[in-house]
Amino acid sequence: MDLQLKGKTALVTGASQGIGRAIAKGLAAEGVELVVTARRGDELEKLSAEIVKAGGKAPHILPMDMLAEDTPKILARDAIKAAGQIDILVNCAGASTPIGWEAADDIWEKAMTLNFTRVRQLTHAILPDMISHQWGRIINITGKSETVGLNASFSAKAGIHAWQKGLTREVSKHGITINAVPPGRIMSEQILRLYSEKDRAEFSAAEIPTGRYGEPEELAVVVVFLASPLAGYVNGVLIPVDGGLRRYSF
């Protein structure tokens, strides 16, 4: 299937590892011109080499810290300058923040800033460019709403879900769609750091109908489709990629 992505441009945040890295490679394989950002510039350089080796075009690399207050405006400006325009925005930068109820305000504020505020600010900074050429795709990598404990990032991601739904009412008339992909247990540096192989096997057997953790590429294919012109009628929705982990039916 031709996804009609060749010649499109995309900005992918959190592209240095895991899901963001797989999304960047998936878009590049479809002929998308990339701007990639993350804190670790060395990992972005490695990503660029992998994309070129696979036959893709070297991405524009913009190492930045999404927690920095001025990053959204600077990143939007520099990404548009590098690629000419931004057709696709993938907000993947973020971090899980499990905490106790007594956690200090600064921990909450950091989690909310990274997982909600910066996503909103960057999106709003990119939107005028999308509106100017009457086309855009925004995909937010979020998280589950089915809570199993207190996690500051869950609250932030729930905010993303509500915000994007409202935003579709404002900007979809300009050919822009906004969707979210909440991951399940997807293999990453963080997963390997937090859960042993035994823990992963036990959790998979008990909680994931598919019986295993997912791979970043299995989520990336969904994002690549949502980024395409073919997904123009998919708008304002959440599409979990979790192997059946979520227990709710709708």
Region annotations inferred by a language model:
Residues 1, 49, 173, 185-208, ...:
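A glycine/serine/threonine-rich, flexible loop-to-helix segment
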Residues 16-17:
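Conserved glycine-rich cofactor-binding loop
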Residues 73, 81, 95-110, 149-152, ...:
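Conserved mid-core segment of classical short-chain dehydrogenase/reductases
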Residues 92-97, 142, 244:
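Conserved NAD(P)H cofactor-binding loop of Rossmann-fold oxidoreductase domains
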Residues 128, 169-173, 232:
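Alpha-helical segment proximal to the catalytic Tyr-Lys
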Residues 137-173, 185-186:
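Catalytic loop of short-chain dehydrogenase/reductase
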Residues 224, 235-250:
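Short C-terminal tail/terminal secondary-structure segment
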